[in-house]
Amino acid sequence: MANAKELKEVLSGPIVSNNPIALQVLGVCSALAVTSKLETALVMTIALTAVCAFSNLFISMLRNHIPSSVRIIVQMTVIASLVIVVDQVLQAYAYDVAKQLSVFVGLIITNCIVMGRAEAYAMKTPPMMSFMDGIGNGIGYGAILLSVGFVRELFGNGSLFGVEILSKISDGGWYQPNGLLLLPPSAFFLIGTLIWIIRTIKPEQVEAKG
């Protein structure tokens, strides 16, 4: 049974020390696509965290009964089943957001973070630790998404969660929104900036040269 210290390390590690986007550079495609609004970034974070946590839990519970030759198929079946559940819940209770997220919820099935944690961690670790690892990686993924979404929506549209924060010139205010921040390439540069900041603070994350 894992003690509280181990659980805390597993939960907090992926947020900064081993962030799936900033350090491992996984899940970047969805991070570019769903961060033009803070609302979609938050919902995507919740969706991926739920899938990652519960897929880790179920795969860990089944790990001693899965033949090595079909383990990837079993993992994808578990993940796909959870993604379908999450997608149906979103369409039932948050239809407008589900439409904005489009295919990206479905693509959680092939998300490198979810697949990677299932194969590298859940297949070798007890259920509770695996569950907490899934939550930690989901929060780490979400921390980057929400940071990028905050900057893009605030300075690209002058709002947060659809509520106007910076009064726009077109409405008689003072702020001219930067439309470039609403384009996907801007997310790429913002993520790069976050990675640079994190690696400046934690230089041990910088890859060795040569």
From Swiss-Prot:
Transmembrane segments: 14-34, 42-62, 72-92, 103-123, 131-151, 178-198
Transmembrane among keywords: yes
Catalytic activity: a ubiquinone + n Na(+)(in) + NADH + H(+) = a ubiquinol + n Na(+)(out) + NAD(+)
Record-level Gene Ontology MF annotations: oxidoreductase activity, acting on NAD(P)H, quinone or similar compound as acceptor
Chief place where the protein resides: membrane
Pfam family, one: Rnf-Nqr
Membrane topology value: Multi-pass membrane protein
Top EC category: translocase
GO CC term, one of those recorded: plasma membrane
Enzyme Commission number: 7.2.1.1
Subcellular localization(s) per the UniProt record: Cell inner membrane
UniProt record similarity statement: Belongs to the NqrDE/RnfAE family.
NCBIfam families xrefs: nqrD (TIGR01939), PRK09292.1 (NF006777), PRK12405.1 (NF009070)
Main function: NQR complex catalyzes the reduction of ubiquinone-1 to ubiquinol by two successive reactions, coupled with the transport of Na(+) ions from the cytoplasm to the periplasm. NqrA to NqrE are probably involved in the second step, the conversion of ubisemiquinone to ubiquinol.
PANTHER family: ELECTRON TRANSPORT COMPLEX PROTEIN RNFE (PTHR30586), NA(+)-TRANSLOCATING NADH-QUINONE REDUCTASE SUBUNIT D (PTHR30586:SF1)
Protein name: Na(+)-translocating NADH-quinone reductase subunit D
Taxonomic source organism: Shewanella sediminis (strain HAW-EB3)
Lineage of origin: Bacteria, Pseudomonadati, Pseudomonadota, Gammaproteobacteria, Alteromonadales
